[in-house]
Each structure stands twice: as C-alpha cells, then as structure tokens.
Amino acid sequence: MPFELTVRYSIPLTPLTDVDEVLREFLSQIGYLSEGADPEATDGSVAYRLMRDCLLRHPDRLWYPEELTAVLKTSKPTVYRHLNRLKALDLLEEVSEAQEGGKGRKGFRLRYGNLGRAWDFVEANAQNALKRYRETVDHLGRLLEDERKPTVPPSSSKGKPSS
C-alpha cells in the first residue's frame, strides 16, 4: 500500500487544551478526517471513534476487524476502509496470527503502541518521499536545461567557397 499523507502549513495546536478538539484538527490536517466537518458529526464518525476510542485509548491492544465492527457498530467493509486509510499513513501495524486449521487472523494496532513513535515512522516516510520528489525536480531541471541549449548544426564542406 502506498504511503499517503496530506501536508499543509499550519500552526501547532499547542494552545488548545481539549483533547478531542486537538485530535479532530490534527486528523483533518493529515488527511484522515474530512476538513471542515461539523465537530459533533466528526466525533460520532467511525473514522474518529476508531482512532479515539479504540487505537488511542488502547494503543498496545491488537484489534481484530470483527471486534472493531462490533465496537463501532458498523460494517466490516467500513472498518477496513478506515483501517486502510490509517495503514496508508503508516500509523498502523498489521499483525498476523496463525490459527488452528492454518488460516491466519489479522489484527491491527497503533504502530509501536505509541502515537509519538508511530508519528516518527510517518515523518521518516514523508522525508523519503520529499527526497524522491527533490531528485525528480533536479532531474527535470537538468532535462529542461539540456533542452534549452542551442543545437549546433553539423559542419558541412558543401556550399563553402573554394580558395
């Protein structure tokens, strides 16, 4: 799954003291929650409750999709849609457990069981992505520079006056 993060310039949310307000704004800034949504609607959304009530409240716990479906009172596809968005941010780790009969069971938890450490992973991915963009921009600049260089026509002895 490709790494995806919305990056926009914003001021730190450190003046805010309400954890739900900070979390709502932060999750909107990084592209996990819809921007500009009504706070009451957001707090009741599956996406928000998955983060707030499950992953952040119990960061070390391994959550199974069936459990999340029951806790969040929603469908399995909805749970997976939000899990996949968090996986794209690289905030989640996926753990497979072998069960009897050979079929594995997947569980999910906040990476490293800690939001700060999980965010370190996100930052590293973002830095790598920006570095690759820089390499592409530099390469594109060189190609454009080469394209602008005047081309010298091949020298020819025809048409020159003889001495």
Where are these regions (language model features)?
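A short, conserved structural fragment
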Residues: K87-Q99
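Short amphipathic alpha-helical interaction segments
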Residues: K73-A88
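Short, cationic-aromatic polyanion-contact patches
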Residues: D43-A47, E97-A124
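Alpha-helix N-cap/helix-initiation sites
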Residues: P39-G44, R61-L62, K76
